[in-house]
Amino acid sequence: MAGVLCACSPKSYDGRDGNNFSVSPFPDYGEVLAFPGAEGYGRHATGGRTGEVYQVTTLADSGKGSLRDAVSKPNRIIVFKVAGVIKLESPLDFSKNLTIAAQTAPGDGVVVYGNRISFSGADNLICRYLRVRMGMNGREGKDAAGIAYGSDMIFDHMSVTWGRDECFSINGDPKKPADQPRNITIQNSFIGQGLQPHSCGGLIQTTINNGVTLYRNLYIDNKTRNPKVKGLNQFVNNVLYNWGNGGAYIMGDTEQKSDADIRNNYFIVGTTDNYDGKKLGATAPFTRYNEHFSAYLSGNFYDDNKDGVLNGRELERTDCMKKSVVAGEEIITSPTFLERPSDIHPEIKGLMTAQEAYEWIVDNGGASLPARDEVDAYLIDELTSLGKKGLIIHTEEDIPTKGAGSIKSANAPADTDNDGMPDEFEDKYGLDKNDPADAMKIASNGYTNIENYIFLIK
C-alpha cells in the first residue's frame, strides 16, 4: 500500500456545533505541550500539528510510503502501518515541523537500522518511540543520531544504539553562537552500546544560553561520555549503568561557562567487561570538572558494589572534588556548587527520587510501545542484574540478538478513510470514519484528533 497523505486546515474549537469543529470527548491534559508528559526545554515543540498526515506503508529505504519520503518534507504527522526493520542504505535527514509517532506501528514496531540519522536543522520536531540502531554498516566516526544546530525538539521513548562515534549527540559549533542547538529535550529514552574502539554515549554541548534537558533516560554500556556536557543542561532522573574507564557524567573540562541542574540520578557500576575480555573499570560518577562548571547537585545515588541489589549511597560534594599538590600547596578542584537550581531551568513536573526513576525506567523506559524489542529487553536484563551483567561491545554481533533481532509484524487496524486513525477509535470517540479531514481538526483540549489517538495508545 502506498503512503497516504491526509491534508486539511486544522480549526480551533469554539464549542458551537459539530459540523466544522471536533467536539472533544478526549481528556483535558491542561497546558498544550508537545504531548502530555513533555518536560524540559523542548516541551513546547508542536511538530506537525498544523500540517498533514503521512502514513509509512513500506519498510523500503526509499520511495513512496517510506520513512525517508515521510521525513523529506516539513509539516507532517507521521504514523506507521507497517512493522519491522527499515534498513537504511544512506544517512537519513529529518525536515522541520514533524511529528514522528512510531508507537502507531503494529506488531513490535519499527527499527531504523544500518546508518546514521540527523536532526540538524529539524526545528520544531516531536519524535517518539523510534528505535535507531546504526551499527557497523554506518561510517566510522559517525554518530547514530545527532544534532549540530536547530531548536525546539523533543525526543521521547527513543532507543538509540550502536553509534561508531557517539550514540546521540547534541553538539553545537562554539564558533557559531547564533546557530547553537537550543530548547531540546531527550526523555524516557535508552542511549547505549556505543561501539568500540570509540564507545560513547554522547556529547551534550551548547553554550550557556542554550538549554538541553535530559530527563529519565538510561545510559548503558558506553565506555565514556554518559554524557559529556557543556552549556545549559538539566540532567534529572537518569540512570547510568556499566560505563567504563572513560567517564560517566563528564563536566565540560573547559573554560567555557556551564550551568547544570543535576538531580536525583542513579549511577550503577556494571561488570565493565570489554568485548575482548578485558575489564575496563569504572570512573567516578563525575569527572573533569572545574570552576567554570556551575552545578546544583542533589539526590544523586551511586551503587558500586555489584551485589545484585540496588543499595547505593547518596553522593556528596566531596565526591565531586579532587585534591592535588602544586608547589607544596594543596589545591582543591571542583565545580562551582550552586545552592539551588538556576531559575532559568524549566520545572520538571514529573520529578522522582533516584530509586523511583530506576524503577520507572525498568518498567516503562525506551521504545516500549507497541512492544519492547529484543535489544531493549537485553539492555533491561543487564541493568536489572545490578552489577552482575554488562558488556561494552565492538559490533552489534557481540550481543545475543546478533543485530536488530526479530521484530514481529502484524496487520494495521482497519482505517476506512485512510486518515491514520483506526475505525474502532473513530467509532468510539464519535468521529467520522468516512471523513479523512477530521484527523487534523483541533479538539477542545488543543490537540488534533490524530494526536489524541496517538496519546491513547497503550
Regions inferred by a protein language model and the residue ranges of each:
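Bacterial Sec-dependent N-terminal signal peptides
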Residues: 4-25
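Acidic Gly/Asp/Thr-rich repetitive segments characteristic of extracellular carbohydrate-active
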Residues: 33-78
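Extracellular beta-strand-rich solenoid/capping regions of secreted or surface-exposed proteins
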Residues: 68-74, 85-101, 110-128, 134-150
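Right-handed parallel beta-helix
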Residues: 97, 102, 123-134, 149-165, ...
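Structural detector of coil-to-beta-strand junctions
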Residues: 116, 144-146, 166-167, 199-203, ...
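Extracellular beta-rich repeat passengers
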Residues: 229-400
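Extracellular calcium-associated, cysteine-rich motifs in secreted modular proteins
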Residues: 399-458
